[in-house]
Swiss-Prot record:
Gene3D superfamilies to which the protein is assigned, alphabetical: Winged helix-like DNA-binding domain superfamily/Winged helix DNA-binding domain
Function: Might take part in the signal recognition particle (SRP) pathway. This is inferred from the conservation of its genetic proximity to ftsY/ffh. May be a regulatory protein.
Protein name listed in UniProt: UPF0122 protein Bcer98_2498
SUPFAM superfamilies for the chain: Sigma3 and sigma4 domains of RNA polymerase sigma factors
Family: Belongs to the UPF0122 family.
Disulfide bond positions: none
The organism of origin for this protein: Bacillus cytotoxicus (strain DSM 22905 / CIP 110041 / 391-98 / NVH 391-98)
Stored Pfam families: UPF0122
HAMAP family documented for this protein: UPF0122
Tree of life domain: Bacteria
Amino acid sequence: MLEKTTRMNYLFDFYQSLLTQKQRSYMSLYYLDDLSLGEIAEEFDVSRQAVYDNIKRTEAMLEEYEEKLMLLHKFQARQQLVAELKQLINEEEHVNDKMKQVVEDIEKLD
């Protein structure tokens, strides 16, 4: 469950601008603010089922966006490469300072 929540938080972060205001609100309250379906339903004066359906549809949309655009995948790949570069730099005693700067610049991109 925690893995799914983390993934949805990342996907929401990358693709929220592609969602409607209602979808953003529901996802933000559910995943970021940790409100229950009932609490969200009460706030928007709709049924719990309506909130559930909207969140499930939005989750599917986010997964579809990721399948096509792969922003999360690319982000994770960059993070992995930066971690490997850092490890190599730390293992090598006389690494060029320029290489260290390049790694720092790559990290700033995210």
